[in-house]
Amino acid sequence: NYKFIIKMINNNFVDKNLNNLIDCVKSASAGIMKIYRSDYFGQEEKSDGSPLTMADTISNEIIMDALKKISPDISVVSEENFSDENLKNLDETYWLVDPLDGTKEFINKTDEFTVNIALINKKKSIFGIVAAPVTGKIWHGSIFDNNEFDNNSVKKLRIVMSKSHKSENDRAFLEFLDSIHIK
């Protein structure tokens, strides 16, 4: 099964479906922005205490519908309809979705939120696409891109963290970076 999935994605899947996946995150972003520009987010609280808005729900519906059309045989796990039962019956290959990553930032109107979709196989990401609804920027990549990375070309490292939920681990990591003179 793994070899079939890799061959399918390597030879055809990403190229064949990339435009559909880009359209998917663009549509989800448009749905999010419609709510973002309004005065009403329809905010609720999930069972874990985190916020949920109409934008999360709309984006999730758009993405779920699109992924079912793009790849009906590949399961979808989304933050908005996640359950432990999903994990028990999960295939080796599945889509992992966060339809609105940064809901607190969305609510606080910081413009710092994204739409995230990854294709996972054997617990490894083999394709991912991220959209920033406010800017309209979209990034994507796969293990098959064969892009070379020149480590010597990196002049400056930027660390990005959530403003709304920094943890002790985050603080410890920043202290570690500071201790090795990375600012």
List the model feature ranges, each with a label.
Residues 88-144:
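DPxDG-like acidic metal-binding loop motif
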Residues 131-159, 165:
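ATP-dependent small-molecule kinase catalytic core of the GHMP/sugar-kinase superfamily
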